[in-house]
Amino acid sequence: MVLKSIKITYLLLYKDLKAIYNTYIEKNTRSKKRGENVERVVLHSDANCFYASVEMLYHPEYAGKPLAVGGDPEARHGIVLTANYIAKRSGVKTGMALWQAKQVCPELIFVSPRMDLYLKFSSMLREIYSEYTNQIEPYGCDEAWLDVTGSSSLKGNGRMIAEEISRRVKKNWELL
């Protein structure tokens, strides 16, 4: 389920993402006084296996089975957009042709993407984020950067906010 795969990272500053982070900070700190040293608290949210996780919420019969979202399973062409962890452990990779994925994992279940549904869930995630900050930088429909610098005094430190968001997402989505 999505609930097990939501990941919120506290103060993510990996080398390859530093340019994105610096651009974001520059864009969102112009109103700060020059020379003011403000410690930023930025969270990175990534709902892993997002499309597959959403599909599993609507199809509990897929639980415990390898699942991939992508292409057109009826026409048997296209690529894997995402796969659940079971499929990934079998060697299925994002971007792999559907026929190759089926060779690697013969029991793989394919479903066609339903972007309207994934965007709905993405919007639900952002609604939760917006209760902690209005500084949300989306990165695709399953990832976002959240600047919670101003929220820390009200909601706790960055780690506490990340854990609370993660708990809320899990709780809310279990109810669907």
Cite the ranges covered by each PLM segment:
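Gly/Gly-Pro- and Ser/Thr-rich, intrinsically disordered tail segments characteristic of DNA damage-repair
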Residues: 9-176
